[in-house]
Regions:
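Catalytic-site beta-strand/loop segments enriched in glycine and acidic/polar residues
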Residues: 100-128, 135
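Residue-level detector of anion-binding/catalytic polar loops
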Residues: 59, 82, 106, 138, ...
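Alpha-helix C-terminal capping segments
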Residues: 52-53, 103, 133-138
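Catalytic core of membrane glycerolipid acyltransferases/transacylases, capturing the structured
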Residues: 3-7, 16-17, 29-88, 96
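A cross-family acyltransferase "interaction/gating" segment
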Residues: 29, 120-150
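Short secondary-structure boundary segments
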Residues: 41, 64, 113, 142-147
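Short gly/ser/thr-rich secondary-structure transition/capping motifs
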Residues: 16-24, 145-149
């Protein structure tokens, strides 16, 4: 994950003038075992910002359409993202996610299935619960909010 940690340092420097990344933990995060980080999804920047906020690398389940963009495909794969065919019960994506969590990794997932900019919580998809049931892993509910640096 050398690419991940290098990219994280570069992105932190580039975004620092514009965004203030703060984290608040209500519980101790698991250090050894894998877990599922389930967050709301309000912006294209969410995976980047969450990656900056967490100490362990996040492996995001991302819509398959993103992997059709040639250069972007290579970058997000190198950062640990993997494709999911939304709305199709993508068993290969579920199996991949289960493997990440069982091997001590952190799965990043947006249970609403897409971005919503209205600030409301929308109907959740079942993926996070299915993966938690298959792995016995904890699900860390996460909320992301954006405020510009003043």
């Amino acid at each position: 994950m050398a690419f991940y940690s290098t990219a994280k340092k570069i992105v932190r420097v580039l975004l620092w003038p514009f965004y203030k990344v703060e984290t608040e933990y209500r519980a101790e995060l698991p250090q050894e075992q894998g877990y599922i980080m389930a967050s709301n999804h309000v912006s294209d920047m969410d995976p980047v910002m969450l990656g900056l906020a967490f100490h362990k690398p996040l492996n995001f389940m991302a819509k398959e359409e993103l992997f059709r963009i040639p250069v972007f495909n290579s970058i997000i794969r190198a950062l640990g993202a993997f494709p999911v065919a939304r709305g199709k019960g993508d068993q290969a994506a579920i199996d991949h996610a289960v493997g990440i969590v069982k091997n001590g990794g952190v799965l990043g997932i947006f249970p609403e299935g897409t971005r919503f900019k209205d600030g409301k919580l929308h109907r959740l998809k079942s993926g996070a619960v299915v993966i938690a049931a298959k792995t016995g892993a904890d699900v860390l509910p996460t909320c992301i909010r954006y405020e510009k640096r003043r």
